[in-house]
Amino acid sequence: MKRELEGSYESERKRGVAQVKAEYVVGAASNVRVDEEEAGSERFVQGEFGGKKNKKKRGQNKNRDNRQQKETHALCPKYVLADVTNQVDLCTFGDNCRFVHDIPTYLEHKRPEITDSVFKTCPVFETLGYCPMGFKCRFLSSHMDKETHKLLGEYPSDLASASHEINHITQDQKYDLIKKRFPFSKSELVLEILDSFQEENREMHREAEKVKEDQQDNEDEQKEKAPQVVQRELEAQKRRQRQKDLYLQYKDTRFFAQEKKPLDLRHKKIVSPLTTVGNLPYRRLMRTLGADVTYSEMALAVPLVQGTNSEWALPKAHESEYPGFGVQVACSKGWQASKAAEALATYIPNGISEINLNSGCPIDLLYRQGSGSALLDNPARMIRCLNAMNYVSGDIPITVKIRTGTKEGHPIADTLVRRLVFETDVAAITLHGRSRQQRYTKVADWDYVSQVAKALRQAEADFMESPQGKESHHDEKTRHTQFVGNGDIFNYTDWYQHLEDPEVDSCMVARGALIKPWIFEEINAQQHLDKTSSERLEILKTYSKFAMDHWGTDEYGIALGRRFFCEFMSFFHRYIPVGILERVPVQLNERPPLWKGRDDMETLLGSSDVKDWIKLSEMFFGPTEDSFVFTPKHKSSSYK
């Protein structure tokens, strides 16, 4: 009988079903879908950029649009913090302004205040002593004199610096990028150097045909040439001569190697870069729960170079994130990588611990453009990007995140890391133990991650014995490129098991930290923590407060905070309480039968219905706005 039970248990486990105690089971296995894309990857859907739209995969809402509407009767920005006792016309547009100038009129048309939230007063005002949303705040009565309509609190002259957020850039700095006034002097030089190396390689391959070309050149010289042709040839000769001079000057040097700030990732608790859900409030939450290192959402290099507002919002961080905050950049060419890194290093040098090149993103659109994991198919281009970034980034270290390869069954990371050691000066390499083709359909291959870590250490030893290594590291006995593993870490046993490998410096946690944000507390305690529904609700309250601190407490900020709250819930609800499980730990790819919690709130927190996520959001953000729209990633349900 015991064998039969064990066989049944193993059979269930093989099917990837989490074992829930019988008294909590209410139905068959739930239909939890495996994510084939990075979290929140709708930013990069083909349909948004024109051309043919992809076929929808596995019931995903690939073209969802969760942008929120703004106020119908919006208050003029010049009057948001105005003194109502002073009737001076603050707006230069006067009667031509499309916004409301009369504050009492605005307050009459404004949406009702939020009164039935767990926040009884404005959470931003409680934190800062003032509310930057002024009259637009949905908790206005907590910081406005009802009789005089005068705002309470002391307002600093520089609201941005007083918000406890870092990495802001000025409007003038953005205009320099938009108007192409930013000099990019370092980028221009390093790109010339890299071009000279490429041209020299091309010339070496053309040697076989040089005789034929010389004969043709002699015939052409006998013919009379137009002045414009002669001028172009002279310019080409000068350009080629400069390339040769640069090549001779730098060919025997590691010109890209620069002195950098120390980067220590050894056994650090690292949260992976996460598109959409890895926003500032979430990262700030993770810092309070034990994370040591956080990364921005993936920023695209070209919009950064162009000064796009939405892209420059991504490197912003809370002051609690630094040191230990990295900015991740995606690009397809060396000039994009170089100029984006130079702009970041010039404008926000004191708020970044590292700049990370994304060479692992599997999203189709970016892959077709040559970004993300497409760089795995072109290691030479990846190396040029890394070297250009390293040259221009000042003292900010450059790191790279890769996958095992692009095709399943054809891993290339073990050979790639050798080239990265010999041909670049990256401070750290993060390896996600899946190929691009796999996405999340199979478990991460940690045996291969371990194999790559050993290959990296062997490459470092070989490099130090080479003439190049002896010359460039003559004061050091060893070279250590930090190596971080990534994939399917969901509990403390996973963490410590992977760190038993001495060649692995640390582990990076992605979906595990979304489903279970207290995972680093478990790692420190070395226990499977059974969080109660009230404790999990407190985590959501903290996230909601951080969301309002960041996006604001006006109508638009509340809608935006609610939207990202629902994005967070799309992962957070997948947690299965330890107390209702037959066995622990549960693996990330295991799904439970339909279950009920130990109390009503626990059941609500585990619901996959978007309407229940909205219900939870109303506890913190007040009643849902009529215009609020949220479409989840999967087509199981939506809210309008």
Curated annotation (Swiss-Prot):
Its top-level enzyme class, in one word, is oxidoreductase
- Name the reaction it catalyses: 5,6-dihydrouridine(47) in tRNA + NAD(+) = uridine(47) in tRNA + NADH + H(+); 5,6-dihydrouridine(47) in tRNA + NADP(+) = uridine(47) in tRNA + NADPH + H(+); a 5,6-dihydrouridine in mRNA + NAD(+) = a uridine in mRNA + NADH + H(+); a 5,6-dihydrouridine in mRNA + NADP(+) = a uridine in mRNA + NADPH + H(+)
InterPro entries with a match to the protein in the record:
Aldolase_TIM, DUS-like_FMN-bd, tRNA_hU_synthase_CS, Znf-CCCH_4, Znf_CCCH
- Region Disordered, residue ranges: 37-70, 202-236
* Keywords attached to this entry: Cytoplasm, Flavoprotein, FMN, Metal-binding, mRNA processing, NAD, NADP, Nucleus, Oxidoreductase, Repeat, tRNA processing, Zinc, Zinc-finger
The keyword Zinc is annotated on this UniProt entry = yes
Top-level taxon of origin? Eukaryota
Catalytic residues per the record? 361 (proton donor)
Q: Name the positions where FMN binds.
A: 273-275, 328, 401, 432, 486-488, 510-511
Compositionally biased spans, kind Basic and acidic residues: 202-215, 222-236
Which PROSITE patterns does this entry report, sorted A to Z?
UPF0034, ZF_C3H1
- Which residue stretches are annotated zinc finger (C3H1-type)? 70-104, 116-146
* UniProt record, GO biological process: mRNA processing
Name the GO cellular-component terms: cytoplasm; nuclear periphery
Basic residues bias locations: 52-61
Please give one Gene Ontology molecular function term for this protein.
RNA binding
Q: Which cofactor does it need?
A: FMN
What EC number(s) has UniProt assigned to this enzyme? 1.3.1.89, 1.3.1.-
The family annotation for this protein states: Belongs to the Dus family. Dus3 subfamily.
Q: Which PANTHER family match?
A: TRNA-DIHYDROURIDINE(47) SYNTHASE [NAD(P)(+)]-LIKE (PTHR45846:SF1)
Q: Outline what the protein does.
A: Catalyzes the synthesis of dihydrouridine, a modified base found in the D-loop of most tRNAs. Specifically modifies U47 in cytoplasmic tRNAs. Catalyzes the synthesis of dihydrouridine in some mRNAs, thereby affecting their translation.
Q: What name does the UniProt record give this protein? A: tRNA-dihydrouridine(47) synthase [NAD(P)(+)]
Annotated organism of origin = Candida glabrata (strain ATCC 2001 / BCRC 20586 / JCM 3761 / NBRC 0622 / NRRL Y-65 / CBS 138) (Yeast)
Q: Which gene encodes it?
A: DUS3
